[in-house]
Amino acid sequence: MPRFVDRVVIHTRAGSGGNGCASVHREKFKPLGGPDGGNGGRGGSVVFVVDPQVHTLLDFHFRPHVTAASGKQGMGSNRDGAAGADLEVKVPDGTVVLDDNGRLLADLVGAGTRFEAAAGGRGGLGNAALASRARKAPGFALLGEPGQARDLTLELKTVADVGLVGFPSAGKSSLVSVISAAKPKIADYPFTTLVPNLGVVAAGGHSFTVADVPGLIPGASQGRGLGLDFLRHIERCAVLVHVVNCATAEPGRDPISDIDALEAELAAYQPTLQGDAVLDDLAERPRAVVLNKIDVPEARELAEFVEDELAQRGWPVFLVSTVTRENLQPLIFGLWQMVSEYNAARPQAAPRRPVIRPVPVDDSGFDVQADGHGGFVVTGARPERWIGQTNFDNDEAVGYLADRLVRLGVEEELLRLGAKPGCAVTIGEMTFDWEPQTPAGGHVAMSGRGTDVRLERSDRVGAAERKAARRQRRERDDD
């Protein structure tokens, strides 16, 4: 079973809004109490929250579906439905949120940072909110809107001050184990490290974090080996350290060629966090070189031979041994000085404020196009939303939808394009046979609650008929 997961695809779905209520106030000595149906509650949203106690995306590996609660339905006596609770999903510090097209949506850094991944649907209006001078007691209410559904990719980019890069078996894990309290797996074969290891290093009264990245090979920036999976973990590192195995016996390998090969991979890698005002490009990050395994005599001679050539590049060079722990203290304090100087020269990250994006109210635009089969397709945010809010089992609700489309100008546009009565018109997921209701801007004839004269339906059971049916049932029971 994997214990460290740094990339997952999750399916988020916000809660739907509650339906509105169609109710009439009933009270003694008040025969005309009027409508009192409450509005539906807002659906809950899916919110990502950075939790410093979470260090992996393992939970999403087994439970990739995240669903928030829906809002409650409105009730009579002007009682609005309860809003659905927001679902707060805890993610590690350094999580990057990408959409299904790979576009960066959020970079979650810092404890408590929040990001609304999926917005909850709005609740439907009750008949009390729909009452007007022409429609004093609506016999219908609007349905709640569905919550937003999104497929998102979460990538964990380790937050560390120093990143150790090098070829397999260079001694990176051993170095982390001796300068910090971390205990990564160490063995004498390549690719022992399969997941990044973090360690906290104490430098006098200060401390900094070190990330041990799994070994890189030529072509890592194009996906060879585990390169693309773990190169992203060094994107946030302030200092990059080349760890070189000076005791390698492989033909064609030497410290200079190893460092040049690693630099070529770092230059070819395209990080996700491009354009970050706080981070430089990887090519501009401070570098240091650790020539490891100088406890071997031949390795010490080779390290001393290339030390001056590497120093000419302007990089600090440290000759160390993780076995004898030689020169570890100069390395620790040297890295701390590089980290502090880099952070002091960079602009401080501005406090991340929650971004409020109100739902636009000026969404009156729509478009009508012929579908090539004698019908028409109406597109637009407002008509499509109205379709989802309409209860098509209620005649008055359908008539109310027709009134809204008339006022918006949809029927006028259909007539202009040559639409004939009975042709198929598609709005959203609904296709119906279009019948002109009334000229655009004209007066709409109104009828009793729950009915619409334009639909010419007379199968609705009225209050008098229900009362007569109850009387007949009582008479049969008495007999």
From Swiss-Prot:
InterPro entries: G_OBG, GTP-bd, GTP-bd_Obg/CgtA, GTP-bd_prot_GTP1/OBG_C_sf, GTP1-OBG_CS, GTP1_OBG_dom, GTP1_OBG_dom_sf, OBG_GTPase. Residues 160-340 form the OBG-type G domain. One of its GO terms (cellular component) is cytoplasm. Keywords: Cytoplasm, GTP-binding, Hydrolase, Magnesium, Metal-binding, Nucleotide-binding. Residues 438-479 are annotated as: Disordered. GTP binds at residues 166-173, 191-195, 212-215, 292-295, 321-323. Gene3D superfamilies: GTP-binding protein OBG, C-terminal domain (3.30.300.350), GTP1/OBG domain (2.70.210.12), P-loop containing nucleotide triphosphate hydrolases (3.40.50.300). Its EC number is 3.6.5.-. GO terms for biological process: ribosome biogenesis. One of its GO terms (molecular function) is GTP binding. Residues 451-467 have a biased composition (Basic and acidic residues). Its cofactor is Mg(2+). It is found in: Cytoplasm. Residues 358-436 form the OCT domain. Mg(2+) binds at residues 173, 193. NCBIfam families: Obg_CgtA, Obg_CgtA_exten, PRK12296.1, PRK12297.1, PRK12299.1. Belongs to the TRAFAC class OBG-HflX-like GTPase superfamily. OBG GTPase family. This is GTPase Obg. The gene is obg.
